[in-house]
């Protein structure tokens, strides 16, 4: 198959997956919460007006629709403009960064939402769960072993290629970058396990599920990042760099999929967001 045609197909898939399917799944989840857990019955779930949250959800949808249009325009530009392919990978990368902007907005909104919830419930008392938290409480030793083995394979692969003295090869700088990524993920995991509670109402069981989901996501992304780094190095070593833009787009598919692993709503205890009944004399 023609490389350009394959790039158009993969990029079209990236547009629809990251800017249509992913937001659609998230919006269905949000509107399901609005419908099944309304403010009148679950007032603690809404520190601000539900209309404000609905407007934010609408803005998120509109932003993604505009990014879809931009993506289709990008494919058209690829088709009609003569190019060498040298900048295709960079263009696909920066388009994904644009696709990420609405989701970054959701993350910032989530931080503001939890801050408002804490400010309104500063006197809330939560029962402490006296249980030590270890990484293996949230993820299996087998999964950790897989992550470690893939990291060791990556280090060994870099060491093997380093002996050929490729002028373009960064050598152990690649190991430093990947190791830095692992350390950054480790810092996020540490904050999640031992940091300040974001949601003052959330039950311990729900928080444990959230932490478990986050850890699985980050370790899965760490695996994806490491494998992608090996693929990119291999494409350069074997002289098939024309596929770089395609592989980075496929990589973004994987990142999008891994980011979409949310706890099921029916597993969440929403009763904690109800008003406590008044005591009768």
Locate predicted features.
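N-terminal leader/presequence-like segments
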Residues: 1-86
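Juxtamembrane inter-helical linkers in multi-pass membrane proteins
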Residues: 31-46, 115-134, 194-212, 274-281
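Short, Lys/Arg-rich cytosolic juxtamembrane segment immediately N-terminal
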Residues: 50-66, 132-141, 211-217
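Internal, hydrophobic cores of structured domains that mediate oligomerization or house catalytic pockets
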Residues: 85-159
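Cytosolic/matrix-facing juxtamembrane and C-terminal tails of multi-pass cellular membrane proteins
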Residues: 188-281
């Amino acid at each position: 198959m023609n490389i350009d045609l394959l790039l158009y197909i993969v990029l079209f898939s990236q547009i629809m997956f990251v800017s249509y399917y992913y937001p659609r799944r998230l919006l269905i989840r949000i509107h399901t919460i609005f419908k099944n857990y309304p403010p009148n019955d679950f007032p603690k779930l809404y520190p601000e007006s539900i209309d404000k949250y609905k407007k934010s959800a609408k803005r998120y949808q509109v932003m993604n629709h505009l990014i879809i249009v931009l993506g289709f325009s990008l494919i058209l530009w690829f088709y009609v403009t003569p190019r060498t392919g040298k900048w295709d990978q960079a263009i696909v990368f920066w388009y994904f960064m644009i696709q990420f902007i609405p989701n970054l907005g959701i993350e910032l909104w989530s931080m503001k939402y939890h801050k408002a919830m804490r400010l309104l419930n500063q006197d809330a008392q939560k029962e402490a769960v006296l249980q030590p938290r270890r990484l293996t409480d949230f993820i299996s030793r087998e999964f950790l072993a897989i992550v470690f083995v893939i990291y060791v394979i990556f280090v060994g692969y870099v060491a093997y290629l380093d002996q050929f003295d490729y002028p373009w090869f960064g050598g152990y700088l690649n190991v430093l970058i990947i190791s830095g990524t692992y350390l950054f993920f480790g810092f996020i995991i540490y904050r999640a396990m031992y940091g300040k509670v974001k949601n003052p109402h959330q039950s311990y069981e729900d928080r444990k599920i959230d932490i478990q989901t986050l850890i699985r996501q980050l370790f899965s992304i760490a695996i994806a990042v490491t494998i992608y780094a090996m693929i990119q190095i291999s494409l350069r070593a074997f002289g098939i760099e024309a596929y770089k833009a395609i592989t980075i787009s496929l990589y973004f598919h994987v990142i999008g999929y891994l980011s979409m692993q949310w706890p099921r709503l029916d597993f969440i205890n929403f009763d904690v967001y109800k008003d406590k009944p008044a005591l009768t004399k």
